[in-house]
């Protein structure tokens, strides 16, 4: 049907992103093979994303557009957390203590010292992390049977794709465009290497 085709086109669009290493089919297989574990990790990731937005607006209180955008983002990510919680509780699961995210930890190593480059790196790594989330939620949506859970993951893929654009727009608002382009290129390579070398598990990263 027309709608089915349209929805599929949206998924295709989500999967086309700036990322330089495509998530392997083995990742989707691992997630679908232990979906409970994936959900628990996913909840933690949403909660941390909300915390990250709050940390950004606390760090840069004088950048009005950023503060407003991060306040909205913190609420949106926490709403996603609340929605994932519903799926978790519906399955009779209990949330688990936070664990370090090896992907985010490795990517954060690339943040440089110095207020301007640090600000740039925070915005660009956040953007790339959102792009990876959009790609992976779209893969999950594609693998799930038609129904509310599939719809949920499709909506998350859309929202992560919006956030990926948001962080890039904020960078363009506050920083030199040549500087952005050069660093964007470097960070995309760094992120691709991280994803290529990390072990595959039933987790967002």
Predicted regions span which residues?
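Non-heme di-metal
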Residues: 5-205
